[in-house]
């Protein structure tokens, strides 16, 4: 799901070690060449630029490579795994505590009816080809994304209009109070230099320029010497794309300065490296279809589940999940309990937090008439207390979480069968069968996307659920004239004292854990304070790579 913004500073837990003897000194460049890349300019050393003190080599997973290039219209910066676009500038930015701040914008205001946003643009900003950045470029960017974006919803935008060279107006189809969050991740492109090949050869005004892209291998970014803001400390950033085991091998060989890793590697130690763990809102949870079986949608997809449609069942499951056990046994201790899709966000309602209470869960089921059978599985009116829990085939963490869930719920008298499936069938099957998902974005729209009735539909998009009061709160939040005031409405959608989607409410989703993002970091590398990472273990880590340094 598309998302925006990041939150409070991450936590770094360090573990020194003594496995292996990595070659090279702290910050040594040239990792791509050393790791077998035949490119004549792989890494800073081979390119003849940068030093051990102003360059860094970062390893990300293969899926982090932007398939369509560095074009905001095709997911760069503003796709599922949101991050700052680096090559382009944005109108706004977010601070470590999720406050909105300005980048290209110098001021903004919204009309009383919420249908017009007026943004003033800073003077003196130029694209890397020397042409000035004006409000015309801003309007062009947003209108282009409205018409062509393949990954984001811009239906709320009617039109962007350049009033003059340094003022742009956004005319909205409907009030959208969280528009500043969208402005924080949309990179501005030059109208004069934009075309079909833009993603391969981007021109921007951001902190970095694309110097080289060896597809399937690496991206090399070079600091923009004419950047209008504070000059980047890291003059060259090399991003290598590797599978998890290859990333660890690169660390063992001393060929990476910072490399992503998984909790399964968390109990290892590597000489010359620290293990950093950053908190996230990268959550895992599963949907529980909230209507009875027997109906279909307009495409004939079966809807509903005769077991999970009982709200007492959903509440009992929420109480019966030992999240701390999952963190220790599945995540090796690297995670936090998840109670909602937006833990720790300014719009998070703490009423979502639940204490592990299997006894109360059992009482709820008893009182609701779910009787324990001789086989240890409950039953009511001929319906067995059972369901299949799907997970994305090939995702070992989701599989382990699903199996742990099944084991825990068995003690409650619920029989859960786990099944790995492909995404080609998951979306349709999830309308009647629980599916373990990964979510987490820096925008309240994540709540809307999960719980609000789909436009023109009868139920929410990803799992059949409907609550008119919840919908109303979210509609009012979007229509609010104040971003801060909207937070309270988002909280009420979660729980207002009588209804909502949390503990004592409808519980159409069960949230399990927020997964820490882990990285091997070469000793001496000072990674700047991290915002709370969103879903995805990729480009978010380098949101502020320009502020990193070497000791």
Positions of predicted regions on the chain:
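Alpha-helical secondary-structure segments
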Residues: 134-141, 165-169, 206-207, 235-236, ...
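Detector for C-terminal structural segments
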Residues: 214, 218, 318-349, 353, ...
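Surface-exposed binding/hinge segments that line
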Residues: 109-116, 152-193
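N-terminal lobe/hinge region of extracytoplasmic solute-binding protein
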Residues: 59-110, 203
């Amino acid at each position: 799901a598309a998302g925006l913004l990041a939150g409070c500073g991450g936590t770094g837990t360090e573990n020194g070690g003594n496995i292996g003897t990595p070659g090279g000194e702290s910050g040594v460049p040239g990792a791509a060449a050393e790791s077998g890349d035949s490119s004549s300019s792989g890494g800073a050393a081979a390119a003849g630029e940068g030093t051990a003190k102003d360059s860094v080599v970062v390893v990300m997973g293969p899926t982090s490579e932007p398939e369509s290039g560095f074009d905001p219209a095709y997911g760069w910066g503003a796709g599922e795994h949101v991050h700052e676009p680096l090559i382009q500038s944005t109108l706004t930015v977010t601070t470590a505590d999720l406050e909105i701040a300005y980048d290209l914008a110098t001021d903004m205001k919204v009309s009383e009816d919420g249908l017009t946003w007026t943004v003033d643009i800073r003077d003196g900003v130029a694209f890397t080809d020397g042409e000035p950045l004006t409000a015309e470029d801003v309007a062009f960017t947003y209108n282009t994304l409205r018409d062509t974006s393949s990954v984001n919803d811009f239906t709320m935008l009617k039109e962007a209009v350049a009033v003059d060279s340094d003022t742009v107006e956004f005319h909205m189809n409907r009030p959208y109070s969280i528009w500043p969050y969208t402005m924080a991740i949309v990179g501005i492109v030059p109208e004069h230099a934009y075309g079909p090949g833009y993603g391969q050869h981007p021109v921007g005004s951001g902190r970095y320029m694309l110097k080289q892209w060896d597809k399937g291998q690496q991206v090399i970014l070079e600091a923009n010497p004419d950047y209008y803001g504070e000059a980047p400390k890291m003059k060259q950033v090399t991003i290598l794309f590797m599978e998890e085991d290859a990333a660890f091998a690169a660390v063992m060989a001393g060929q990476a300065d910072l490399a992503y890793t998984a909790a399964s590697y968390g109990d290892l130690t590597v000489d010359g490296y620290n293990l950093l763990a950053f908190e996230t809102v990268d959550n895992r949870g599963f949907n529980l279809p909230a209507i009875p079986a027997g109906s279909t949608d307009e495409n004939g997809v079966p809807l509903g589940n005769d077991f999970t449609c009982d709200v007492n069942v959903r509440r009992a499951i929420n109480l019966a999940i030992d999240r701390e056990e999952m963190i220790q046994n599945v995540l090796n201790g690297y995670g936090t309990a998840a109670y909602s899709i937006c833990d720790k966000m300014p719009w998070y309602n703490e009423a979502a937090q639940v204490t592990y209470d299997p006894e109360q869960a059992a009482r709820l089921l008893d009182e609701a008439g779910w009787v324990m059978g001789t086989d240890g599985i409950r039953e009511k009116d001929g319906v067995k207390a059972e369901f299949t829990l799907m997970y994305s085939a090939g995702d070992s963490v989701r599989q382990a979480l699903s199996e742990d869930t099944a084991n825990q719920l068995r003690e409650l008298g619920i029989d859960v069968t786990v099944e790995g499936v492909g995404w080609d069938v998951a979306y349709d099957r999830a309308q009647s069968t629980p599916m373990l998902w990964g979510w987490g974005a820096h925008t309240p729209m994540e709540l809307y996307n999960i719980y609000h009735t789909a436009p023109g539909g009868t139920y929410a998009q990803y799992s059949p659920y409907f609550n008119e009061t919840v919908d109303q709160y979210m509609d009012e939040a979007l229509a609010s004239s104040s971003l801060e005031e909207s937070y309270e409405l988002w909280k009420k959608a979660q729980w207002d004292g009588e209804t909502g989607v949390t503990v004592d409410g409808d519980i159409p989703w069960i949230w399990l854990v927020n997964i820490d993002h882990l990285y091997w970091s070469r000793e001496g590398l000072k990674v700047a304070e991290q915002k709370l990472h969103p879903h995805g273990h990729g480009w978010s880590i380098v949101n502020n790579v320009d502020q990193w340094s070497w000791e």
